[in-house]
């Protein structure tokens, strides 16, 4: 169903409203004082009667301050007929009129620069073009409205988008925490709602390191929001890596645009390969924090830190901030299950070593997306280095009932094999 001129015309109706006739020089004061009383979309006729419409019914008394304004400025109350329609209505008002009673107007949409995207339900899909056009018309700052077609079924976490209204362009500039991020929403993973989570971890890293000598290994960096922000906020040094070549392109652009070339080093390779190259001294980066924001897969990469001391000779062990899913009815069960998954890669890990456990969101009643912060344990760091055979992400219990919003999900993942020297 598309929004046509006929549909717009069907929303028009004529109704009586109270109007006030006043001198031209009073109009600005009236508009400022009684903005909430003004009938939506009303216009005054400066050359004719200088009429300003107000949205008060005849049965209701006029507000006292409005009565005083009328008296003090010798205004006259008039009754007028006005034609109202699509242009006078809000997004919700239009869709309440046009959608069937069993279909709710979607309220949950994300704004990315001048792009708005929905995750429409099955009931809403027949009306997707109508919904998209109404949203575009009622939000003048938007240029593109789209819908994500399905869950993220590729290793790069990029969405499949359907244009609903506006320009077929997904380039965007997003301001966040003092940086400007350039991206193409169709080619890279982006979630605006992770802003506060990045803020939380940056503050926690500052607390752990007393705000000094912070060196972050950002293994799944996307277009670089975390690395750029912590570089700006805490003067941190960052090694920012992502497997997606498109992310790497925008990462480079964002580093230059935000003038952090001396603080953020970009990479485009598999996360394990990055760590192995550091061990082999092919990459010179002495990190003290590891940021692993890839919830479906990040825990599977923890085994690369087994034997850290053996491979690097360093006794100062890094802090690790890793994201993943867990199931449980309370925090204790969630932590226990999360910990058991970590132990598969780091056999010396114990849940008593957890420094901070944070729930980002509920996926289902029992399943949560979580972030766990801990310091690499001495036993794992000093044990013999060796990668662990990883569970198949497609058969994992954590993939069985995935109902997470599409922007936070990867189902089919590729665990790239890296040759160990």
UniProtKB/Swiss-Prot annotation:
- Single GO molecular-function term? tRNA (guanine(37)-N1)-methyltransferase activity
According to the UniProt record, what class of enzyme is this? transferase
- What is the predominant subcellular site recorded for this chain? mitochondrion
Which E.C. number(s) belong to this protein? 2.1.1.228
Chemical reaction(s) catalysed: guanosine(37) in tRNA + S-adenosyl-L-methionine = N(1)-methylguanosine(37) in tRNA + S-adenosyl-L-homocysteine + H(+)
Report the GO terms under cellular component. Answer: cytoplasm; mitochondrial matrix; nucleus
Q: What residues does S-adenosyl-L-methionine bind to?
A: 198, 242-243, 270-271, 293
Which UniProt keywords are listed? Cytoplasm, Methyltransferase, Mitochondrion, Nucleus, S-adenosyl-L-methionine, Transferase, tRNA processing
Q: Name one GO biological process term.
A: tRNA N1-guanine methylation
Compartment annotation = Mitochondrion matrix; Nucleus; Cytoplasm
Gene3D superfamilies recorded for this chain?
Met-10+ protein-like domains (3.30.300.110), Vaccinia Virus protein VP39 (3.40.50.150)
Q: Which InterPro entries match?
A: MeTrfase_TRM5/TYW2, SAM-dependent_MTases_sf, TRM5-TYW2-like_MTfase, TRM5/TYW2-like_N, tRNA_Gua_MeTrfase_euk
What role does it play? Answer: Specifically methylates the N1 position of guanosine-37 in various cytoplasmic and mitochondrial tRNAs. Methylation is not dependent on the nature of the nucleoside 5' of the target nucleoside. This is the first step in the biosynthesis of wybutosine (yW), a modified base adjacent to the anticodon of tRNAs and required for accurate decoding.
- What protein family does this chain belong to? Belongs to the class I-like SAM-binding methyltransferase superfamily. TRM5/TYW2 family.
Q: How does it assemble?
A: Monomer.
Q: Which PANTHER family match?
A: TRNA (GUANINE(37)-N1)-METHYLTRANSFERASE 2, TRNA METHYLTRANSFERASE
Name of the protein this chain belongs to: tRNA (guanine(37)-N(1))-methyltransferase
Which species does this protein come from? Paramecium tetraurelia
């Amino acid at each position: 169903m598309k929004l046509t001129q006929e549909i717009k015309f069907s929303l028009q109706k004529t109704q009586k409203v109270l109007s006030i006739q006043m001198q031209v020089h009073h109009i600005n004061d009236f508009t400022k004082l009684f903005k909430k009383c003004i009938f939506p979309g009303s216009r005054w006729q400066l050359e004719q009667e200088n009429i300003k419409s107000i949205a008060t019914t005849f049965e209701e008394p006029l507000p006292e301050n409005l009565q005083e304004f009328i008296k003090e400025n010798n205004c006259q109350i008039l009754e007028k007929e006005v034609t109202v329609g699509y242009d006078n209505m809000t997004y919700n008002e239009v869709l309440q009129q046009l959608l069937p009673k069993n279909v709710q107007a979607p309220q949950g949409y994300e704004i990315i620069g001048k792009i708005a995207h929905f995750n429409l339900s099955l009931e809403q899909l027949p009306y997707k073009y109508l919904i998209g056009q109404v949203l575009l018309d009622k939000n003048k700052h938007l240029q593109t409205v789209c819908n994500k077609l399905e869950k993220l079924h590729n290793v790069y976490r990029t969405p499949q988008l359907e244009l609903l209204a506006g320009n077929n362009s997904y380039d965007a500039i997003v301001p966040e925490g003092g940086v400007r991020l350039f991206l193409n929403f169709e080619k890279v993973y982006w979630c605006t709602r992770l802003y506060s989570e990045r803020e939380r971890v940056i503050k926690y890293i500052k607390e752990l390191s007393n705000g000094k000598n912070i060196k972050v290994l950002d293994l799944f960096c996307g277009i670089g929001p975390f690395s750029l922000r912590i570089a700006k906020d805490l003067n941190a040094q960052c090694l920012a890596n992502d497997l997606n070549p498109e992310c790497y392109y925008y990462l480079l652009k964002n580093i230059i645009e935000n003038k952090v070339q001396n603080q953020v080093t970009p990479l485009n390779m598999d996360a394990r390969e990055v760590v192995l190259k550091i061990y082999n001294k092919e990459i010179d980066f002495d990190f003290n924090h590891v940021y692993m924001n890839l919830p479906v897969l990040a825990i599977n990469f923890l085994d690369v830190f087994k034997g850290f001391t053996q491979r690097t000779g360093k006794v100062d062990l890094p802090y690790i901030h890793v994201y993943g899913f867990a199931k449980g009815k309370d925090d204790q069960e969630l932590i226990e299950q999360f910990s058991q998954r970590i132990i598969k890669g780091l056999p010396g890990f114990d849940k008593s070593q957890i420094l901070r456990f944070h729930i980002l969101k509920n996926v289902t009643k029992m399943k949560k997306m979580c972030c766990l912060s801990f310091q690499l344990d001495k036993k794992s760091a000093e044990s013999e280095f060796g990668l662990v055979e990883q569970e198949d992400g497609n058969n994992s219990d954590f993939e069985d009932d995935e109902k997470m919003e599409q922007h936070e999900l990867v189902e089919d993942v590729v665990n790239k094999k890296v040759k160990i020297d």
